[in-house]
Amino acid sequence: MTIVLSRTARSIPPNVFERMDRTVAQARARGVDVIDLSKGNPDGFPEARIRAEAKAAVDSPANARYTPFDGKPLFLQAAAAWYAHEHGVALDPATQLFAIEGAVDGLAAAFAVLLDPGDVVAFADPYYPSYHCMARMLGAEELPLPARAELGWLPDLDAVPGETWDRVKLLVLNYPNNPTGAQAPPEFFARAVELAARHGFAIVHDFAYAGLSVHENQKSLLTVPDARDVGIEIVSLSKMYAMAGWRAGFVAGNEQLVAAVKQYHYQMGSMVTSFVQDAGAAALAGDQAFVREQAARYAARRAIVAEGLRATGYNVFASQGGLYVWAQAPAAMTGEELAARWLGEAGVAALPGSCFGRTGAQYVRLSLLQPSQRLHEAVARIGKLSPDMEKLHA
């Protein structure tokens, strides 16, 4: 018997990260020493005080029970404190914050409560693949906004006609950006908020890489006056505190949207693990030196990869934040061809830019989540392919 699956199940695109994991595993099974720069899986370890809080929390009998649906008050208060001391934003923990199991959990809920079949969702291209996948599963119409290198890999919001904005139900922003590492200046966010108010759409800002900038930290969307009238922000603890495997984050901002996400999540999600919330509260409310140290470490790694590739002849975007390097393939190649060559001939795995939309088709994304020694080795291996570069750039 063949079981007929739902339209939703039939519409799910392949996961590009899972596919690359299989490709890397197959290469390693053949004996290749692969330096995997394809995935944003942090190689750090939560600092000692966060681990100590988690260990102590495991031994608390109260933490063997279900937690409050919205999140433990301690965690939500710590999230509010983080917004206050890091961004100067005052939030009500009871109505403007909600605990989630990482950014994708919050994104899925936000997409679900905002989009009906046929609704239009806009996002910059290149984009994090889940935006496309979630839109497709919900039957929404996608409006990619091409980001431009000359604009610092930001889209030109004013290039979109007013009648097109009138059709948009949701605008998704993501800065520091995955995959490009671009950051958005305050005036960009302010313009997005102005357009949302004028044309009646909501904004979701995916703030997964908060705190991880090269120089000046990316500002929160919620620092913009009136931003809370039109949108929410989704923050993850995965990258800031090297807690990717622990799964925690929060939704913040507009009370109506936060309430809708809560109601959806009550039925379709799960509470964040109790002791993870306790550890997360310690991370958020305490000193942020660990985050600054991580940002400095990633900046040093970024310099290794970016400068090494430039020395070989590649055009590399001067990314301002996040965990990735965004490099252009030579003129005669696509990003897919370049990534295949790097893996096949140098044992270096990177993701083709086409995984992130059409605009990135001639680019590759390299993650910085390997020790510096391995990054130096990756650049050296790629450099050995350089005799062909003059021909490829012709």
Predicted feature locations:
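Conserved glycine-rich beta-strand-loop-beta hairpin in the small C-terminal domain of fold type I
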Residues: A281, A296-A306, V316-Q328, G360
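N-terminal small-domain helix-loop-helix segment of the aminotransferase-like
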Residues: T2-S6, R10-G102, A109, A283-G286, ...
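Conserved core of the PLP fold type I
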Residues: D59, N63-E194, G211-L212, Q218-V224, ...
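PLP-dependent enzyme catalytic core of the Aspartate aminotransferase-like
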Residues: A81, A332, R341-L351, F356-A394
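Conserved core segment of the aminotransferase class I/II
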Residues: R228-A299, A303, E307, S386, ...
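Hydrophobic residues in well-ordered beta-strands that form the structural core
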Residues: F123, P144, V172, I203-H205, ...
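Helix C-cap/helix->beta junction micro-motif
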Residues: A27-R30, L138, L195-H199, T312, ...
